[in-house]
Amino acid sequence: MSASVKESLQLQLLEMEMLFSMFPNQGEVKLEDVNALTNIKRYLEGTREALPPKIEFVITLQIEEPKVKIDLQVTMPHSYPYVALQLFGRSSELDRHQQLLLNKGLTSYIGTFDPGELCVCAAIQWLQDNSASYFLSRKLVYEPSTQAKPVKNTFLRMWIYSHHIYQQDLRKKILDVGKRLDVTGFCMTGKPGIICVEGFKEHCEEFWHTIRYPNWKHISCKHAESVETEGNGEDLRLFHSFEELLLEAHGDYGLRNDYHMNLGQFLEFLKKHKSEHVFQILFGIESKSSDS
């Protein structure tokens, strides 16, 4: 069943609130119509009958390296996020060809989101993480090229801690996102819930953003390990796939939503995957060998 326009507009207002909290300074978020949000609120409250104009705005992003600015133009169709968002990035430091490539990459990334997922914040993060290469490639066109260097990628492993992971729909989402992004690792359900995700940096960061967005509060990345690699990173992986890890519940409470996972079993699992060192990082206690 398709979502109603009113439901879509409510989600748009929610995302705009998040954007204004992310960019609180005057002029960072510039609405094409300063009354746009007010008109939508009136429409949702029933004091305005006509469908309000679409939300259109520009966000000015400061890219740290190189020191440049990107203006991200955004148009939210009335049925967004259930239909595609309209995005376009501009910068005076990019020529026409590089600007085209930048927007092609951005559009391709946004196309990976499912209908109903808000994605402006993710688009901003993508630009902040990935735009530098487009400016660099423009610079190389005008500068004498030196001996080509192998392209390096960052291989990342994130250790994520949650108070608990019980709900079936959340567990399914975690597995689906992990397999879609071709990362490896595991999700240990129960209390506490532990997730390990490893792969290229951009894939892991997208995984992290997607699973906790929009309202998973009791979750944090406790530890991250990264290394530069010129290969595909396969030799750096500690896991061969992304799977759900089901361990015995301490005290055998069955399916009750208050059971604690058997941390002794979890420690043995970590040892098998050369990750015993993260036990103390995750739980604040030193691991003890079962042989002692």
Swiss-Prot record:
Gene3D superfamilies: Ubiquitin Conjugating Enzyme. Residues 14-134 form the RWD domain. It comes from the Eukaryota. Pfam families: Prp3_C, RWD. InterPro entries: Phi-like (IPR017359), Prp3_C (IPR010541), RWD_dom (IPR006575), UBQ-conjugating_enzyme/RWD (IPR016135). SUPFAM superfamilies: UBC-like. This is RWD domain-containing protein 2A. It comes from Macaca fascicularis.
